[in-house]
């Protein structure tokens, strides 16, 4: 027991008490005890940090999957709008051809101008809807790509932040990290 106490505390000839700062020269048992104590006090901190990091990663993955599903739904809606626009365009083309045949028999010049103007307006409307659908798809794909890139860039930074926090905690507990 005396050796046990003397490995931590040195009693000099003047009878003064001080801590033995050279732990590596004391013995292997003290080193093992020190490691056990450090592990005991730091395991809760490490477990909390790792579990919170895991929760963050899982929530980020879930959010990304939700955004991808939303983007897929929007893509399906945009494709449906596109097909409806194509059907409407075909119907308009058929109607225009029928109207042109009728116009040859009646007042050709006036009705032709009105019909052409109407057809151009419809084409402009369809073109606008087509561009709007394309821009929506492009925007969603760009947002998803940027979010994935940002998530990939932030992941290593967050791991470095975790190591800085752990090193600071070790220094607060009086540990020496070399």
From Swiss-Prot:
One GO CC term, this protein: proton-transporting ATP synthase complex
Magnesium as UniProt keyword: no
Keyword entries, A-Z: ATP synthesis, CF(0), Chloroplast, Hydrogen ion transport, Ion transport, Membrane, Plastid, Thylakoid, Transmembrane, Transmembrane helix, Transport
Membrane-related topology note: Single-pass membrane protein
Superkingdom assignment: Eukaryota
Membrane spanning stretches: 26-46
Cell location: Plastid, Chloroplast thylakoid membrane
Pfam families, per the entry: ATP-synt_B
Molecular functions per Gene Ontology: proton-transporting ATP synthase activity, rotational mechanism
InterPro entries: ATP_synth_b/b'su_bac/chlpt (IPR002146)
Main location: plastid
Biological role stated in the UniProt entry: F(1)F(0) ATP synthase produces ATP from ADP in the presence of a proton or sodium gradient. F-type ATPases consist of two structural domains, F(1) containing the extramembraneous catalytic core and F(0) containing the membrane proton channel, linked together by a central stalk and a peripheral stalk. During catalysis, ATP synthesis in the catalytic domain of F(1) is coupled via a rotary mechanism of the central stalk subunits to proton translocation.
Family, per entry: Belongs to the ATPase B chain family.
Misc. comment: In plastids the F-type ATPase is also known as CF(1)CF(0).
Assembly and oligomerization: F-type ATPases have 2 components, F(1) - the catalytic core - and F(0) - the membrane proton channel. F(1) has five subunits: alpha(3), beta(3), gamma(1), delta(1), epsilon(1). F(0) has four main subunits: a(1), b(1), b'(1) and c(10-14). The alpha and beta chains form an alternating ring which encloses part of the gamma chain. F(1) is attached to F(0) by a central stalk formed by the gamma and epsilon chains, while a peripheral stalk is formed by the delta, b and b' chains.
Family annotation (PANTHER family): ATP SYNTHASE SUBUNIT B, CHLOROPLASTIC (PTHR34264:SF3)
Protein name: ATP synthase subunit b, chloroplastic
Lineage, highest ranks first: Eukaryota, Sar, Stramenopiles, Ochrophyta, PX clade
């Amino acid at each position: 027991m005396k050796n046990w106490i003397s490995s931590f505390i040195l009693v000099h000839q003047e009878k003064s008490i001080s801590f033995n700062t050279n732990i590596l020269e004391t013995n292997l048992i003290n080193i093992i005890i020190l490691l056990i104590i450090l592990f005991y006090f730091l395991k809760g901190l490490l477990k909390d940090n790792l579990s919170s990091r895991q929760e963050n990663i899982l929530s980020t993955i879930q959010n990304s999957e939700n955004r991808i599903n939303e983007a897929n739904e929007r893509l399906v809606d945009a494709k449906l709008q596109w097909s409806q626009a194509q059907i409407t365009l075909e119907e308009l083309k058929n109607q225009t051809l029928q109207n042109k045949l009728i116009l040859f028999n009646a007042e050709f010049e006036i009705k032709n101008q009105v019909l052409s103007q109407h057809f151009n307006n419809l084409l402009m409307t369809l073109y606008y809807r087509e561009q709007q659908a394309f821009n929506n798809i492009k925007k969603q794909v760009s947002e998803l790509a940027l979010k994935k890139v940002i998530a990939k860039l932030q992941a290593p930074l967050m791991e470095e932040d975790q190591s800085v926090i752990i090193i600071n905690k070790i220094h607060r507990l009086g540990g020496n990290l070399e």
